[in-house]
């Protein structure tokens, strides 16, 4: 088996200031990648990345990017790709969540979720695609969700946006496969992040997520634990690496068996 070294690979990482994205950033730098890390939370990105900039001054560049404006995102990402003579890899971890019953959620919130989670991520993929096509190589790994395949109460818009994203990734992956470009998804289940904690209350937290809840029509987690951000990051690095050289259009679910692989 080949190692998962990404030495000198140029990676655009979108959504890198917290949670899964920040763990992916740490793993990419440890693997030797040259990373352009972008996030809409600029101040948080600066604060979180301070120690990484000290340890990897020649590998890390920080940028601000807001996926709420997809047309601007596509143009900006394309410009960055031109500046670095093309990215080898794109990783998108960005996403937003509003928690409310879908039958009551304001359309403004539904629209904002789709704009960021589906259209903004698509804009990133479009932004790197032309330079990858010209070089006849590249890979994209997009963070999806196991909620794309399994209905969940109070996060219906989020799940629907991720379902749309999954199909966008697979379709663009099919279009780009003849050019040697691989496009894959990593779909986390419950993971120890701030977004996950938005769903927890005093009565419903980590233990209940693991055990499952019939009233919420939720199975538990067969592995009896929630994921850590590093679990997701390691899956991302595998799909970026040469070990996954014949894998594309794939959804790698990292949820401890919570959706029984359906």
UniProtKB/Swiss-Prot annotation:
InterPro entries xrefs: DHB_DH (IPR003560), NAD(P)-bd_dom_sf (IPR036291), Sc_DH/Rdtase_CS (IPR020904), SDR_fam (IPR002347), SDR_superfamily_enzyme (IPR051122)
Superkingdom classification of source: Bacteria
EC code: 1.3.1.28
Catalytic activity reported: (2S,3S)-2,3-dihydroxy-2,3-dihydrobenzoate + NAD(+) = 2,3-dihydroxybenzoate + NADH + H(+)
CDD domains, per the entry: DH-DHB-DH_SDR_c (cd05331)
Pathway in which the depicted protein is active: Siderophore biosynthesis; vibriobactin biosynthesis
GO process terms (BP): siderophore biosynthetic process; vibriobactin biosynthetic process
EC supergroup of this enzyme: oxidoreductase
Pfam families assigned to the protein according to its UniProt record, in alphabetical order: adh_short_C2
Residue positions of the active site: 158 (proton acceptor)
Positions in coiled-coil regions: none
Residues the entry annotates as binding NAD(+): 12-36
Stated role: Involved in an early step of the biosynthesis of the catechol siderophore vibriobactin. Vibriobactin is a chelating compound involved in transporting iron from the bacterial environment into the cell cytoplasm.
Protein name, per record: Vibriobactin-specific 2,3-dihydro-2,3-dihydroxybenzoate dehydrogenase
Species annotation: Vibrio cholerae serotype O1 (strain ATCC 39315 / El Tor Inaba N16961)
């Amino acid at each position: 088996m080949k190692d998962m070294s990404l030495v000198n690979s140029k990676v655009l990482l979108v959504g890198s200031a917290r949670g899964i994205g920040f763990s992916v950033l740490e793993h990419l730098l440890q693997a030797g990648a040259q990373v352009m890390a972008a996030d809409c939370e600029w101040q948080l990105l600066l604060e979180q990345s301070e120690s990484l900039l000290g340890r990897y001054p020649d590998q890390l560049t920080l940028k601000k990017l807001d996926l709420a404006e997809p047309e601007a995102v596509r143009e900006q990402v394309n410009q960055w790709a031109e500046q670095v003579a093309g990215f080898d890899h794109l990783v998108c971890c960005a996403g937003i969540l509003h928690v409310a019953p879908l039958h009551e959620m304001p359309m403004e919130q539904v629209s904002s979720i789709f704009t960021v989670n589906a259209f903004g991520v698509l804009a990133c993929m479009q932004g790197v695609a032309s330079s990858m096509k010209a070089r006849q190589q590249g890979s994209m790994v997009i963070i999806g969700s196991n909620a794309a395949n399994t209905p969940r109460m109070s996060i219906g818009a989020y799940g629907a946006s991720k379902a749309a994203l999954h199909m966008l990734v697979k379709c663009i992956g099919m279009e780009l496969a003849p050019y040697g470009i691989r496009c894959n998804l990593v779909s986390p289940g419950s993971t120890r992040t701030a977004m996950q904690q938005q769903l927890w209350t005093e009565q419903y937290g980590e233990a209940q997520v693991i055990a499952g809840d019939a009233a919420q029509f939720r199975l538990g987690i067969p592995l009896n634990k929630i994921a850590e951000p590093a679990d997701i990051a390691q899956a991302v690095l595998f799909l970026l690496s040469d070990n996954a050289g014949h894998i594309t259009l794939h959804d790698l679910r990292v949820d401890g068996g919570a959706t029984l692989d359906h």
